[in-house]
Amino acid sequence: MKILRKLHFVWYMFMVALVFFIMYPLFYYATRKRERNVFLGELRKFWCKLAFKLGFYGHHFEYEQPIDFSKPMVIVANHSSYLDTPLICVGIAGDYHFMGKVELLKHPVLKLFFQTVDVPVDRDSKIASYRALKKVEQNVKEGQSLILYPEGTMSLIAPEMLEFKSGAFKIAIDCDVPILPVTFLNNYELMPGNGKTAGSVPGVMKVFVHKPIDTAAYKEEGGLEKLSTEVFNIINQKLQNYANR
């Protein structure tokens, strides 16, 4: 069984890379100019959907209410699987970008995006972190949604989450845009964070997209911590309810 899990993990990752390199000319074209970002989002969605299909994954999204993705927002989610990022590309639309660790600049696939559209952050450098924060704030103010994982890294103890960092919530408050919480319910069961060693299994990925939270009420002193705690509890409650089903 362990061998089959590892074989499936290798197969899925190969499909991700294969589809990416076939589509590379389109990705290269779409990442050259800012006004092509919506087109890039559609390309990412197609890429991820096809890779999922070839990797024997299905997906089911449940939305608490209809979401207008034409308006900028900060989208935050729990992070415990390599499936999280491609899955969120399937479930959203519009003009968006990611913020992620600087190591992704060396990733054979993702470096194209982090050298152009997405924003890398070096958490070991206060100056680099500040510059990255200002960059994404400017992008959001110009109408581009931001996607990031407030845990800061992948949780290896899912369904337990790591403590949230405040960056995502500060950006949302400072830019006067809503926070959109997203809960990945079972990705860690299909492909855990240590998937390189534990492997993966096919299945249906389940996602709950919560209603947006207006950040206008969190500008007062203590509002940042209050917002972070509230979003953590919203995502965690849904995650734990599913885990204890």
Task: Describe every region a protein language model picked out.
Residues 63-68:
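Glycine-rich helix-loop-beta junction characteristic of Rossmann-like nucleotide cofactor-binding loops
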Residues 61, 75, 98, 207-209:
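Generic preference for hydrophobic
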Residues 2-60, 112-113:
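A transmembrane-helix-recognition feature enriched in membrane-embedded lipid enzymes
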